Amino acid sequence: MNEFLMSKGIDVVESDLGERILQLMHLAPSHIVMPAIHIKREQISEMMEREMGTEKGNIDPTYLTHAARKNLREKFLHADVAMTGANFAVASTGEIVVCTNEGNADMGTSFPKVHIATMGMEKIVPNLEALGVFTRLLARSGTGQPITSYTSHYRRPPEGQEFHIIIVDNGRSDILAKPDHIRTLNCIRCGECMNTCPVYRRSGGYSYTYFIPGPIGINLGMLRNPEEYSDNVSACSLCLSCSNVCPVKIDLGEQ
């Protein structure tokens, strides 16, 4: 989406620190939760010196984080539109929920007059009771926290602002029609299957050709285009560790 918007002359700024680092370095993410985990702080320091004018050679993570925060705050203040995804959506209330540890969703949606949220249809849970279960599962499996630092609920826009929710199919209905693979849509994007996978842990996210790496990416790539992404299957060791740790019980190794 970023490339399409930029091709239309729209300035796109990632607000998640990891994604922002990758955007400025023109790199793809290597992990679904920690996208820039493969980047050394020395590389980040060099990039921020070039892009933000930070102190040369300063690789202190706190210093670099504060510099990025200051830079992003200016972007937030002058943004015309905020775009977010959604970790979950609640059918009974009509709200979406965005989970972050940086507060970038709150800050990013507070100043612009328009908020556009895009989400896959599999993100919908029936009610707030179910939401409580899934937010705890996501945080525990994704980062080992009881809950993310920020769990933001969006139901209606503030007065004078706009809020649009776009629910995406993009092949999900085709997966629903396949009984052997329907549970793949249970994925909450916690990244636990990547963290436990012996192949991913040794080869990294760039060794996969589908844009989502790891065991869940192998499955999704094969469902999307088996001819194009069949080479990823060789990255499975059949140890089934991914199936054992998956919080939503996707039998990734059996898929």
Where are these regions (language model features)?
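The feature marks the mature, well-folded catalytic cores of soluble enzymes
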Residues: M1-D180
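Ferredoxin-type iron-sulfur electron-transfer modules in oxidoreductases and energy-metabolism complexes
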Residues: G160-T184, Y200-Q255
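Phosphate-binding glycine-rich loops and their immediate beta-loop-alpha structural context
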Residues: C187, G191-M194
